[in-house]
């Protein structure tokens, strides 16, 4: 069954699924958050090993590596599409290990993501469906669940913020930032945001502030020693 619901609707460019990491036709494109928003560039990966390297190289961060991992598993399925069923499963199991361990600090959760993709692959093989597309659909469904859960949190968060008030963020909260602003817009509530820069990668200055701006909110970047 093809996924039609998209929980990223109405969010900033940076939070759209295709602009995090996306598999299509034998490639995974990952938005390079190391240079965004000064440059909008995508790193194109043509093997799952290249996806693992991109994750290791901090091309994407926050929740981005988990989406990249799932899309990397879809790419692995494409790589081994001409093999026998047993060979495909062995190849995907090896890819699971490669991608899961791309970044030591995320290995445990990454393994859960990749294991889920492996189960989606097994089901697709039993049903005779294209494995790469089945894994991508699984990844989109996982994103939908996560985004929707965070959206429910945002619905409780927004009423706590006074109209015309001030919110200070920290680092890049990714989905909760976008969903908070989306729910605020739906409620007709406006407020100002201050984003500490977040050294050394400047996630606050580059990512959080850009999401706030893209969604139409007044945002000011401050240095990390200014919040007090």
Name the predicted role of every residue range.
Residues 11-127, 132:
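Long amphipathic alpha-helical segments
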Residues 17, 24-26, 61, 163-165, ...:
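Short coil/turn connectors at secondary-structure junctions
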Residues 32-34, 47, 69, 170-173, ...:
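Fold-independent oxyanion-binding glycine-rich loops
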Residues 34-38, 43, 208-209, 213-228:
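Glycine-rich oxoanion-binding loops at beta->alpha junctions
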Residues 69-77, 117, 157, 176-184, ...:
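Buried hydrophobic packing segments
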Residues 135-172, 176:
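Active-site pocket-lining segments that scaffold enzyme catalytic pockets across diverse folds
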Residues 148-155, 177, 203, 220-226:
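Active-site glycine-rich loop that binds ribose-phosphate moieties when present
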Residues 170-221:
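Glycine-rich phosphate/diphosphate-binding loop of Rossmann-like nucleotide-binding domains
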């Amino acid at each position: 069954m093809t996924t039609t619901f998209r929980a990223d609707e109405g969010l900033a460019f940076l939070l759209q699924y295709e602009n995090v990491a996306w598999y299509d036709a034998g490639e995974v494109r990952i938005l390079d958050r190391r240079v965004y928003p000064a440059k909008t560039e995508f790193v194109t990966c043509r093997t799952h090993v290249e996806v693992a390297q991109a994750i290791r190289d901090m091309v994407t961060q926050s929740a981005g590596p988990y989406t990249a991992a799932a899309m990397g598993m879809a790419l692995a399925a494409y790589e081994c599409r001409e093999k026998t069923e047993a060979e495909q499963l062995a190849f995907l199991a090896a890819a699971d290990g490669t991608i899961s361990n791309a970044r030591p600090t995320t290995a445990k959760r990454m393994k859960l993501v990749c294991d889920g993709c492996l189960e989606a692959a097994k089901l697709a093989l039993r049903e005779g469906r294209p494995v790469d597309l089945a894994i991508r659909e699984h990844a989109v469904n996982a994103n939908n669940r996560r985004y929707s859960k965070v959206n429910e949190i945002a619905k409780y968060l927004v009423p706590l913020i006074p109209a015309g008030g001030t919110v200070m963020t920290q680092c890049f909260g990714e989905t909760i930032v976008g969903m908070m602003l989306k729910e605020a817009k739906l409620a007709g509530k406006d407020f100002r945001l201050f984003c500490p820069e977040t050294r050394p990668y400047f996630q606050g200055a580059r990512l959080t502030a850009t999401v706030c701006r893209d969604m139409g909110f007044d945002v000011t970047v401050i240095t990390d020693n200014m919040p007090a």
